[in-house]
Each structure stands twice: as structure tokens, then as C-alpha cells.
Swiss-Prot record:
Quaternary structure annotation from Swiss-Prot or TrEMBL: There is an equilibrium between the monomeric and dimeric forms. On peptide binding the dimeric form predominates.
Domain of life, per lineage: Eukaryota
The protein's name: Neurophysin 2
Description of post-translational modifications: A shorter neurophysin molecule (1-90) also exists and is probably derived from the complete protein by proteolytic degradation (in vivo or after extraction).
Annotated function: Neurophysin 2 specifically binds vasopressin.
Pfam family membership, one: Hormone_5
Length: 92
């Protein structure tokens, strides 16, 4: 079994590669917000062909999602607003 620590970050995506893929049609970045089902997220479909699992985002949220941008929690298929993702996002 692989621990969370060993999962690589998903592919970069979006303007300037500043986002990360969170699902096959979801690209999010701290400064970008989230693109769902748009051209910015097309690259994320490439993850389907890569053998190793990936996980973007630092902080878990909801039931099995990850904080993707300020106030946004993303799952593989969709994103929802999530107040707990506002707090200290990206600050360690």
C-alpha cells in the first residue's frame, strides 16, 4: 500500500502551467481558480494514460476531495465551494 506521501502531484496545466490537474477535466491553481471542462483542462486527460496514481492539492476536504484553490474543494469529477479551503491555503 502506498502512503499519501508517495503520490506524485498530477500534471501541470492551465496558463503558464501554473495549475495542477485534479481530475480528467479539472485544472486548478491558487492564483487561477478552477477550470472545469474547458480547454485549460484538456491536458488532464493525459493522466488516464499514466500508470502511476497522482494527487494534487495539499489539504484534504469534504469526503475524499482536496483543496484546489481558495475556498474550492475538488473531487475527480467536480468542484464545490468549501470554506475550510480558504484558511491558509498554500501557506506552511
Amino acid at each position: 500500500a502506498m502512503s499519501d506521501m508517495e503520490l506524485r502531484q498530477c500534471l501541470p496545466c492551465g496558463p503558464g502551467g501554473k495549475g495542477r490537474c485534479f481530475g480528467p477535466s479539472i485544472c486548478c491553481g491558487e492564483e487561477l481558480g478552477c477550470f472545469v471542462g474547458t480547454a485549460e483542462a484538456l491536458r488532464c486527460q493525459e493522466e488516464n494514460y499514466l500508470p502511476s496514481p497522482c494527487q494534487s492539492g495539499q489539504k484534504p476536504c469534504g469526503s475524499g476531495g482536496r483543496c484546489a484553490a481558495a475556498g474550492i474543494c475538488c473531487y475527480e469529477e467536480s468542484c464545490v465551494t468549501e470554506p475550510e479551503c480558504r484558511e491558509g491555503a498554500g501557506i506552511h
